Structure formats: C-alpha cells, structure tokens
A protein has these predicted regions:
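Mature N-terminal segment immediately following signal peptide/propeptide cleavage
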Residues: 23-43
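N-terminal signal peptide c-region/cleavage motif recognized by signal peptidases
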Residues: 13-15
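Short alpha-helix boundary/capping elements
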Residues: 35, 63, 133, 137, ...
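Active-site substrate-binding loop specific to GH73 endo-beta-N-acetylglucosaminidase modules
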Residues: 91, 103-110, 142-235
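N-terminal accessory alpha/beta regions
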Residues: 40-156
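Sec-dependent signal peptide recognition
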Residues: 1-7
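Boundary of Sec targeting at the N-terminus
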Residues: 19-20
Length: 235
C-alpha cells in the first residue's frame, strides 16, 4: 500500500515540477490532502522540499498507535442486552445514558488525536478506513468495540490491505454492525458477506449470489465472547 500511496502523494504534490521546491501553494495543497488543516509552520517546513522529499517526509513519520490516552472507562464490563432488560427501569435508563455519554467522549478522544497528532496522514487514513469499513454506535451500542476498531484501523492504516481485511472481518464492532455475530450454520446471515464483496472489495456486479452464500458459509463461526466483547471463533 505504501508504494501506491507514494504515487498518489506525488500526484497530490504535482503543483511543482519534480525537482523544484514545492512552494507555499503546492505544500499547502499536499498537506491539506494528506491531513486536515495545515498550520503556517507546517506549510513553511514543506515549502522548500521537492515532491519526492515531501512524500518521503510524510511517510517517514507515520504512526500505528494513538498517542492520546484511552478513555478511563475503556475496560469497563459491558452489559448484554438480555441482562440490560432485567435491570430496573431507572438502572436501565442510567446505563443507556452512560453509553451515550461514553460515545460522545469517544468522539472527543478521536478528535483530540486528530488535532494533536504530529502525523496527520495517519489520522487521515484512519478516517478513510473508518468510512470504508463502516460501523456506528446506535447498532454496535457499546463504545468499547468501536474504540478497539479505531485502534485496529490505525494499526493497519498504511499497511497491507489484505492484512487489514483479514483483521476487520474478525472485528467485534463490524461483526455486530453487519450481523456477522449472528451468522450460524443452518441459519446463515449474508449481510457481512455481501458488504464484504460489494462495498469492501469487488464492487457491484463483480460477484454472484453463489459467491455471497459461500462467503457467508465461510464466515460462520466468527462470533463475540459475551462476557468480554472480544472476537471468538465458534466451531
């Protein structure tokens, strides 16, 4: 993926010829496309660089882990839906309010990482994969799996797509969001298999219904430990 990204970044920096200094305009364009909103200091640092030097600097500092400390509740035990229904009304309402608060805190945690990171490219690519392998709080319910998915996307943000794909189909947040955790032998759920082919890899019209059914069969057993929220494989 890094070779492909290098080529893309060189195109993004094409406002200047290959051996000339980028200049402020091309540097700002490159940093905007590979990050969020570059500061004047960042633009000034890239302005005297050639295209190749700029790309090499961008790729040299990439990260695979977040620098912002995790939210304090990240290892709290999750309450399963069946257990939640057994709670008194006031406790159930309080727990749901807690989940909403934690989800907002999780968004704030990631926004802080985006703002403070010394490597905006890492967060830009993490955001790209977050939009590609979509999961959302209303269905996932718990913020802990979404936090761990964010870590996973960052770890592989600039690595092998094949490695990321193998990891993401075992990701608890995605398994919940696309019903992979309820895909059972004899009672297949094809949602994850269909999205895997149509949205994540091949594209519409490049697979058959038989492909979907066989992929769903191959993904049976991918499940979640109800006590920890971690991925488990059930035979």
């Amino acid at each position: 993926m890094l070779r492909l990204l290098s080529a893309v970044l060189l195109l993004a920096a094409s406002g200047a010829s290959a051996e000339q200094a980028l200049g402020d305009a091309a540097a700002r364009q490159l940093l905007t496309r590979t990050g969020f909103a570059p500061t004047a200091g960042e633009v000034a640092a890239f302005s005297p660089l050639t295209q190749r030097q700029a790309v090499e600097r961008l790729l040299a500092g990439t990260l695979t882990v977040a620098r912002t400390p995790a939210p304090a509740w990240i290892d709290d035990k999750i309450v399963l839906p069946r257990d939640l229904q057994r709670l008194p009304d006031d406790e159930r309402r309080t727990y749901r309010q807690t989940l909403v608060r934690q989800s907002l805190e999780l968004r704030g945690w990631w926004l802080r990482e985006m703002v403070d990171t010394p490597v905006p490219l890492t967060e830009r690519m993490t955001l790209f994969w977050h939009n590609h392998f979509v999961s959302a709080q209303p269905k996932v319910l718990w913020p802990q799996p979404l936090y761990r998915q964010n870590l996973l996307l960052r770890e592989h943000a600039l690595g092998s797509f094949a490695t990321l794909l193998h990891a993401i189909v075992r990701d608890p947040a995605l398994l919940i969001y696309l019903d992979g955790a309820t895909n059972r032998r004899g009672q297949p759920n094809e949602n994850l298999a269909r999205e895997l082919m149509e949205l994540f890899t091949l594209g519409q019209g490049r697979y058959t219904e038989t492909d979907v059914k066989e992929a769903a069969r191959a993904l049976t057993g991918h499940s979640i430990d109800p006590t920890t929220g971690a991925f488990v494989y059930r035979r």
